């Protein structure tokens, strides 16, 4: 499985647990592939080329916010710093949360990719300037969240409940989730009945999904 197809497949993971069993997996995959060619591929490249350090994900949050709003989500910004919370209410049912982390790492990219990051940024935590890259796959995560938003919005007849999409800051520093909780995340937006997160992994064979409860 190529990296391109792996990203598409991972995007489908978010959807598979929420869509009705009547939805065709083949149709869903075709829809995701079409969206990747038309929009998500360029969005991924943009996120990869423009990474931001923990607590400084300003541009990333703005771009993800615009994507989610364009698909009909009500988005609140500045939650726990640069965090965002997007809600779509769709009748009675559970509140389901999907989370994607947004921050890059203070590393210089040497991939040789035509869209490799050349970014540098002042780290608000240390006060030092670092090269920045998406070395942990968060560019894949937020692109997949944007793709999930579109697929779920277009399939509202296939599910019922409330969908909460979260763009989490500062995951790499183990700070962002706590910051959002201190900002009264559950009290303001509701406590999820189910919460889902995913992460790409270089330690797993391509095409393999490892599911853990926690």
Segments the model singles out, each with a brief description of its role:
Residues 1-10:
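Bacterial N-terminal signal peptides that target proteins for export
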Residues 3, 91-93, 191:
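Intrinsic-disorder/low-complexity coil detector
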Residues 9-20:
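Bacterial N-terminal signal peptides
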Residues 13, 47, 184-187:
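Alpha-helix boundary/capping residues
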Residues 21-25:
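Sec/Tat signal peptide C-region and signal peptidase I cleavage site
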Residues 26-134, 140-161:
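Acidic/His- and Gly-rich active-site-bordering loop/insert found
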Residues 122-133, 139-140, 157-214:
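Histidine/acidic-residue-rich, glycine-tolerant segments that coordinate divalent metal ions
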